[in-house]
């Protein structure tokens, strides 16, 4: 049997359409973790998802005339090792932009 102690970890997944807003949110989270003596690893970039929508330009006849729109979803992961109660409280009070989706796993 292994005698290694399981280390506690928080995994934060971030998603956003705007890459700059996502990077600013990652910087805030890492800065908060560093200020509370926790170890932050990341941000680890995940593949960007592209969703393309094809729409007819004309409401009536011209099927050959189409327009394409796309949305890009940028994603990042941040791992925080050995978090304290102070770290968790600071992360809960953190004010992040509304365009960033955050998922936290303990």
Curated annotation (Swiss-Prot):
Keywords for this protein: Ribonucleoprotein, Ribosomal protein
GO cellular component assignments: ribonucleoprotein complex; ribosome
InterPro entries, sorted: Ribosomal_uS10, Ribosomal_uS10_dom, Ribosomal_uS10_dom_sf
One protein family per Pfam: Ribosomal_S10
Function per UniProt: Involved in the binding of tRNA to the ribosomes.
Assembly mode: Part of the 30S ribosomal subunit.
Name of the protein: Small ribosomal subunit protein uS10
């Amino acid at each position: 049997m292994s005698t290694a102690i399981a280390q506690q970890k928080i995994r934060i997944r971030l998603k956003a359409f705007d890459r700059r807003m996502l990077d600013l949110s990652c910087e805030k989270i890492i800065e908060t973790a560093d200020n509370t003596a926790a170890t932050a690893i990341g941000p680890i970039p995940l593949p960007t998802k592209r969703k393309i929508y094809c729409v007819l330009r004309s409401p009536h006849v011209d099927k050959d005339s189409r327009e394409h729109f796309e949305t890009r979803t940028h994603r990042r992961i941040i791992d925080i090792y050995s978090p304290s109660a102070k770290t968790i409280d600071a992360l809960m009070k953190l004010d992040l932009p509304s365009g960033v989706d955050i998922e936290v796993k303990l």
